[in-house]
Amino acid sequence: MISILPSRDDRVVASGSEVAGGPAGTRVLLGATWWNVFRVLILMTATAAAVGYLSKYYCLINGWGEGKYTHLCYSDIPPLYSLRGLADGAIPYISDLPADQVLEYPALTGVFVYLAARLTPAGNTDWFFDVNVILLLICWLVAVIATALAQRSRPWDAAMVALAPGIILAGTINWDLLPVALVAVSIALWAHNRPTWAGVFLGLGIAAKFYPLLLLGPMFLLCW
């Protein structure tokens, strides 16, 4: 399969590539180095995640209360750790909690949150946030790799997911990267004519967040 090189296909990338020697030439040896497209995408994602984590530095140092809005470091994750009883060992949807303490996320996200709570030393809010950052980074990586595999002739397009400003700034506001990863896998499977498994992962995405329901419309049209 012919792989489309961004420095030849995209004028913006071609212009930016001048700082590294210019667009790929006709004699370029693809795959001749250890740095293949997937390793570069993983590095991009990890770097973007580090930048996103540092954007929460003020709250990590000074707490998640006062100043979280003015310093652009707000996240649902730390306050919900205590407000939803997770710090006390509560199990989402199962433990007997007051109505205003019930976790407001769909079931699969609740499982994800509970897993993070189980991996966190009891009552340590900052640790809970850090554990979630790691788990959400895994989701982000899954989304990037799935996007690269969806159209194998254009794997570099996944760099738009790896370096997405919206994910860098808001990826740890809540747990939305979980359904993003599941939907990305679903789309990759659909692109490779695996409709049954695509449906399974779309269903898992819906179990984590309701927005993947919107994909059912286009899928029905494609199946018509």
List each language-model region with its residue ranges.
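Transmembrane-helix signature of polytopic, membrane-embedded enzymes
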Residues: 145-164, 197
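Perimembrane helix-loop-helix junctions
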Residues: 214-224
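TM-lumen/periplasm interface segments of multi-pass membrane proteins
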Residues: 2-153
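Membrane-interface junctions at the ends of membrane-embedded or membrane-associated helices
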Residues: 191-200, 223-224
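Transmembrane helix irregularities
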Residues: 190, 204-211
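Specific aromatic-rich, kink-prone transmembrane helix
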Residues: 146, 179-195
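Multi-pass, polyprenyl lipid-linked donor-dependent membrane glycosyltransferases
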Residues: 135-138, 158-163, 167-185, 208, ...
